[in-house]
A protein has these predicted regions:
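Conserved active-site tyrosine of GNAT-family acetyltransferases
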Residues: 106, 111, 134
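A secondary-structure capping/hinge motif
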Residues: 113-115
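Conserved G/P- and acidic residue-centered "switch" motifs that form tight phosphate/ATP-binding loops
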Residues: 69
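Acetyl-CoA-dependent GNAT
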Residues: 4-64, 75-76, 81, 137-139
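Conserved GNAT acetyl-CoA-binding A-motif
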Residues: 82-95
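Conserved beta-strand-loop-alpha-helix junction that forms the acyl-donor binding cleft
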Residues: 66, 92-102, 120-125
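Terminal substrate-recognition subdomain of acyl/acetyltransferases
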Residues: 117, 125-139
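Conserved residues at the C-terminal ends of beta-strands
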Residues: 44, 93, 117
Length: 139
């Protein structure tokens, strides 16, 4: 199975345990009958100190599960969990500008775009693409 959560380098099983254990909250979208994982997210503080009330999350959805609204359900749950864990704002630092499906979802769910960071994301081929930070105030 291809990795769900892409990083510059792949995580090995022991490093995965440490990585996920270091999050404030991690969730998976799983078919309870088959055990197949369709997506996941991680939730953690975006910063420390006087900005520690702002959280950040990262999402991954299997390519063969796109269109099933898995991402939407993960983001909705993340909004609830962020508030339940005492955060006041959920901020996405690096939404790639060409990821229009994610951007439309975030905007539909009430996220506000903060601007554009030119060439903020390095693509696999070494080129750069703009990123769009977003935020959502939590209940």
């Amino acid at each position: 199975m291809a990795p769900l959560f892409r990083r510059k380098t792949c995580l090995r099983q022991t490093r995965e345990r440490c990585f996920f254990a270091g999050q404030n909250f991690s969730a998976i979208a799983e078919d309870v009958d088959t055990g197949k994982v369709y997506g996941l997210y991680i939730l953690h503080p975006n910063n420390v100190g006087r900005c520690s009330h702002i959280c950040n999350a990262s999402y991954a959805v299997r390519q063969d599960a796109r269109g099933l609204h898995i991402g939407e359900k993960l983001v909705q749950d993340c909004l609830v969990q962020g508030a339940a864990h005492g955060f006041g704002v959920l901020q996405f630092n690096a939404v790639v500008a060409s990821n229009i499906h994610a951007r439309h979802l975030y905007e539909r769910l009430g996220f506000v775009q903060l601007g554009v960071i030119p060439k903020g994301f390095r693509m696999k081929d070494g080129s750069y693409e703009d990123i769009c930070p977003y935020y959502h105030e939590l209940g």
